[in-house]
């Protein structure tokens, strides 16, 4: 952008010099040339402003889209972790995950003290057996536990700004840690080429190169199926 700006300024300076020369040598054409000169300068000014605003506009739209994708990936992570807490594994299927959110429930234990309980002399199990503690199991829907009533669950699978035509890629698996423990893992991601579709191609390429040097990935992603990373998002790097 800097090179283009310099070129435009040089052209403007050259035109100004030519204008002064012609006005001095050909006074009869002074008014006509002033009009033409003004029009040319307006066009150059518009072009210059456009060049300056181009990366600014890209950054604004890029941040908007990327933040929307990150929020949706956080919702996927929250749902996946709840699914694993109940079933001991992650799922690679959005249909399974959405069905879990919409139809499943959590069991919540509630303890009610009904007498004097000396915890140094009696365990919780003994207190329940003796009737000193009353244990009640209640169920709460997964949806109500994780999301607000107005949240559209069905949108969770779709990459923002794709008119619900492109889904996040989601995978699940198992990896072995350095201490030889088998750990359940998952990942979900959106490639920048899809997330930034319709935006300036060169600006997209520049941003992809910039982020790849940091994350070694051409998109925004949560989790990993190649390593246990505690379901971290690569936007945190």
Task: Report residues per predicted region.
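Hydrophobic membrane-insertion alpha-helices, especially the h-region
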Residues: 14, 34-50
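N-terminal alpha-helical signal peptides/signal-anchor transmembrane segments
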Residues: 66-87
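Amphipathic alpha-helical segments typified by the pilin-like N-terminal helix
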Residues: 47-71
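Alpha-helical transmembrane segments
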Residues: 5-9, 32-39
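Membrane-interface helix-boundary motifs at transmembrane edges
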Residues: 23-34
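Low-complexity, acidic interaction segments enriched in glycine
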Residues: 84-237
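Non-cytosolic membrane-interface motifs at loop->transmembrane helix junctions
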Residues: 2-6, 30, 62
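Membrane-embedded alpha-helical segments of integral membrane proteins
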Residues: 1-24
């Amino acid at each position: 952008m800097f090179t283009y700006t310099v070129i435009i300024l040089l052209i403007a300076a050259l035109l100004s010099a030519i204008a002064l020369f012609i006005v001095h040598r050909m006074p009869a054409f002074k008014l006509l040339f002033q009009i033409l000169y003004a029009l040319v300068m307006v066009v150059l000014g518009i072009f210059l402003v456009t060049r300056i605003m181009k990366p600014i506009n890209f950054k604004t739209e890029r941040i908007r889209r990327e933040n929307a994708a990150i929020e949706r990936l956080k919702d996927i992570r929250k749902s996946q972790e709840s699914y694993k807490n109940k079933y001991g594994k992650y799922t690679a299927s959005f249909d399974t995950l959405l069905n879990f959110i919409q139809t499943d429930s959590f069991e919540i234990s509630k303890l009610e003290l009904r007498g004097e309980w000396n915890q140094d002399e009696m365990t919780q199990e003994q207190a329940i057996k003796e009737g000193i503690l009353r244990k009640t199991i209640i169920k709460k829907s997964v949806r109500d536990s994780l999301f607000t009533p107005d949240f559209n669950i069905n949108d969770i699978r779709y990459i923002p700004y794709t008119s619900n035509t492109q889904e996040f890629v989601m995978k699940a698996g198992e990896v072995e840690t350095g201490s030889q423990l088998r750990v359940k893992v998952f990942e979900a991601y959106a490639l920048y080429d899809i997330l930034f579709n319709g935006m300036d191609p060169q600006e997209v390429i520049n941003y992809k190169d910039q982020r790849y040097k940091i994350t070694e990935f051409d998109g925004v992603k949560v989790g990993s199926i190649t390593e246990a990373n505690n379901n971290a998002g690569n936007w945190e790097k």
